[in-house]
Amino acid sequence: MRRIAVMGAAGRMGKTLIEAVQQTPGAGLTAAIDRPDSSLVGADAGELAALGRIGVLLCDDLAKVVDEFDVLIDFTHPSVTLKNLAFCRKAGKAMIIGTTGFSVEEKQLLAEAGKEIPIVFAANFSVGVNLSLKLLDMAARVLGDDVDIEIIEAHHRHKVDAPSGTALRMGEVVANALGRDLQEVAVYGREGQTGARDRKTIGFATVRAGDVVGDHTVLFAAEGERLEITHKASSRMTFAKGAVRAALWLDGREPGLYDMQDVLELR
């Protein structure tokens, strides 16, 4: 059995991850961690996820359970994830990282850690989204400079980063396929007298409202026709199942910084 620890276990995504781990053959939750000031520390993780008692108590320090897990799943905040990364690197533990909002410099820290431990880092662990990335690469290569490209994403009102990590990853895939640098061609929102659109730019539009789990559309607009590639998530469980799948896939892997394209053999 692959022994899995979940960081941020008392949160919405954490609870969903606990459920996904317990539902997956070959995986088992052996540690659950949350912030030290959480009033839920000491509670049974299974009960937090409405699964009933499973005998794994929520703790407040990763060091307390270092011998209890093989791989840590972390969907928290960049500052928290980087601390956990340093811990897992020192302890020789594998990581699944679904946290978004990292800076370029912080992503480099992930790459450095990948030289010593196996890591799967992805902006989105949904199988559908990762298939979409493959389709986006194909579409961009075929359509080339003959289209305007816009990325529209929507998430719930509590999401703190924008554009979403998934939208940015979609932009990176499209830009790379076209031989462009996303940092140079991205346009984040428009207002006022913007002038005519530069065809080589990639536009981003962000919506934050209600309880939207995650909608992403990439629009390729030409004269007389347009192509839209859309993915809509209706449940966080799709991300959680992908993360657990990645945790099982990492078993026995050499150190490296992998992503879901590797897990799904889409390269």
Swiss-Prot record:
GO molecular function: 4-hydroxy-tetrahydrodipicolinate reductase; NAD binding; NADP binding; oxidoreductase activity, acting on CH or CH2 groups, NAD or NADP as acceptor
Enzyme Commission number(s) from the entry: 1.17.1.8
Pathway: Amino-acid biosynthesis; L-lysine biosynthesis via DAP pathway; (S)-tetrahydrodipicolinate from L-aspartate: step 4/4
Cellular component per GO, a single term: cytosol
UniProt catalytic activity: (S)-2,3,4,5-tetrahydrodipicolinate + NAD(+) + H2O = (2S,4S)-4-hydroxy-2,3,4,5-tetrahydrodipicolinate + NADH + H(+); (S)-2,3,4,5-tetrahydrodipicolinate + NADP(+) + H2O = (2S,4S)-4-hydroxy-2,3,4,5-tetrahydrodipicolinate + NADPH + H(+)
One Pfam family here: DapB_C
Alphabetic keyword roster: Amino-acid biosynthesis, Cytoplasm, Diaminopimelate biosynthesis, Lysine biosynthesis, NAD, NADP, Oxidoreductase
Subcellular location as annotated: Cytoplasm
Entry binding sites for (S)-2,3,4,5-tetrahydrodipicolinate: H156, G165, T166
Binding-site residues, NADP(+): R35
Main location: cytoplasm
Annotated positions binding NAD(+): G8, A9, A10, G11, R12, M13, D34, G98, T99, T100, A122, A123, N124, F125
Any one of the GO BP annotations: diaminopimelate biosynthetic process
Active site location: H155 (proton donor/acceptor), K159 (proton donor)
CDD domains: DHDPR_N
Its biological purpose: Catalyzes the conversion of 4-hydroxy-tetrahydrodipicolinate (HTPA) to tetrahydrodipicolinate.
NCBIfam families (UniProt xref): dapB (TIGR00036)
Assigned protein family: Belongs to the DapB family.
Alphabetical list of PANTHER family matching this protein: 4-HYDROXY-TETRAHYDRODIPICOLINATE REDUCTASE 1, CHLOROPLASTIC-RELATED (PTHR20836:SF0), DIHYDRODIPICOLINATE REDUCTASE (PTHR20836)
HAMAP family: DapB
Protein name per UniProt: 4-hydroxy-tetrahydrodipicolinate reductase
Species in which this protein is naturally found: Pseudomonas entomophila (strain L48)
Gene this protein is translated from: dapB
